[in-house]
Regions:
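Alpha-helical transmembrane segments in inner-membrane proteins
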Residues: 1-199
Length: 199
């Protein structure tokens, strides 16, 4: 229902019936008569954005629950533990170094940065002592470290236009999300959910 509502609302209001007919035409090959412009807006833009947003929401909720369960601390999340900051650093490094600015290369860079940040936080926590409190404090320190590295990379390595694009990307925006993004996000989210539920 939320996906359908997200596809119906926007600058151009589209009835829910049109959203349902468009989805049925695209998914099941139904032959409902739908205005071509409305169908293009719904399928190519709004439903794709709504699906990516849903995948992101599920992934964030799942990662938060897993971290809170592992650390037995309600404060634990990817932002406080520095994982999100490390992912940002990895993606920015990939973009700046010209290793590819495509969806897969940015995602792999972000994943590598997140793993590196997690390793750094684990080392800091081990040095600080055992306990969930030490992990949280190490995560905050790691988050600040990787945020500083990201800012340094952007300031030293990018021209003004590139820096603007990177900062816009870091702030997060789903306006450019399309179906290839869904095909990348959905399997990862489903696999992660299955693994977490199985454990």
């Amino acid at each position: 229902a939320a996906l359908a509502l997200g596809a119906a609302l926007g600058e151009t209001a589209i009835p829910l019936s049109t959203v349902a007919k468009t989805a049925a035409n695209q998914i099941f090959g139904a032959g409902y008569p739908v205005d071509a412009i409305d169908a293009g807006i719904v399928w190519n833009y709004r439903l794709a954005r709504a699906a990516v947003a849903a995948c992101c929401g599920v992934a964030l909720a799942l990662s938060g629950v897993v971290l809170q369960a592992l650390l037995r601390n309600a404060l634990a999340d990817p932002y406080i533990l520095g994982i999100s900051a490390g992912a940002s650093t990895g993606a920015v490094a990939v973009a700046i170094l010209g290793l590819g600015a495509g969806l897969v290369s940015l995602s792999m860079g972000a994943f590598a940065g997140a793993l590196l940040a997690f390793g750094v936080v684990a080392l800091l926590a081990r040095a600080a002592g055992s306990g969930a409190g030490a992990i949280i404090l190490a995560g905050i320190a790691g988050s600040q470290l990787f945020n500083a590295i990201t800012s340094f990379i952007v300031a030293r390595s990018a021209n003004a236009e590139q820096a603007r694009g990177i900062m816009f990307w870091l702030l997060g925006n789903l306006s450019g999300a399309r179906w290839p993004d869904v095909t990348l996000a959905l399997p990862v989210v489903v696999l992660g959910a299955v693994v977490c539920l199985w454990q």
